[in-house]
């Protein structure tokens, strides 16, 4: 069963508390000019930011967002005349300075029927340096009657000066068991099956909720099998890099990152204390270095680098570290 895309932040029970906090803050006075919504991937950043915009524009302040007024109808269709989304331009992975300048021009105009205006920057970490500097000036002197919302899963990639001008809302993630229960109720399947998927994909419920359980389990098994074969020397890094260089590139790296992280956490546990001996520390250090490489490659994927070459270098280093450390992820983890 595929429940389809998430339509509202109210479908995510772990967001009810931050939503209540926002309502309480708005009831206590004037809303801030700028908000920074942060949280780990899978927490529901975009739907929460959309909820903020709907709340801001709704004409029924007692029930906002009411879902039935003209503003809510516009927002639901993605066509509100006083809301301006700011996203990377087509065929680009950046938000550019000319887009920010155009946004400033739009916000300087009178709103439709004198209404308030808003902008949503998502994903905000895609602002390039010039665009971020231009946006900072807007934050320092925000247009009257406007709300600026930035949403990002990588706030450290925004300039500190931009972050400091915003009120930050950090969204929580549910416990893995809660995520699995939610996925089971929404998408079908058992919580145990979804926990197996999340053990590799990471605790990112909204990222996998549109997947069929069977497909998610198959992809999880394939990634574990690839990691096992790489560690055993049964797969060549060059050939595996060619296979991984597809539309699942990022999810594969996320899965590899989680497998390594899980291994390192288990190695630090009391069940395998021998791995913490002085003689074995270089092996663990090599695993941490591979983990850093995986995270760096995920960031580089958003730049015009040779992705296939980067994957080959990463998987070659991973194979050497896996063999040295005796890395052997279990298919039934």
Tell what function each PLM region has.
Residues 30-31, 76-80, 112-115, 142-145:
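Short loop/turn elements that form and flank the Walker-type P-loop nucleotide-binding site
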Residues 80, 100, 132, 163, ...:
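ATP/adenylate-binding site constellation spanning eukaryotic-like Ser/Thr protein kinases
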Residues 62-95, 156:
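AAA+/P-loop NTPase substrate/partner-engagement loops
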Residues 119-123, 135, 146-152:
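Structural recognition of the conserved hydrophobic beta-strand(s) that form the central parallel beta-sheet
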Residues 86-91, 108, 117, 170-174, ...:
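Localized chelating/binding microdomains
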Residues 1-55, 63, 71-74, 144-146, ...:
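Charged, glycine-rich active-site and insertion segments that engage polyanionic ligands
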Residues 21-26, 94-118, 125-126, 130-138:
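Conserved alpha-helical scaffold flanking the Walker A/P-loop in AAA+ ATPase domains
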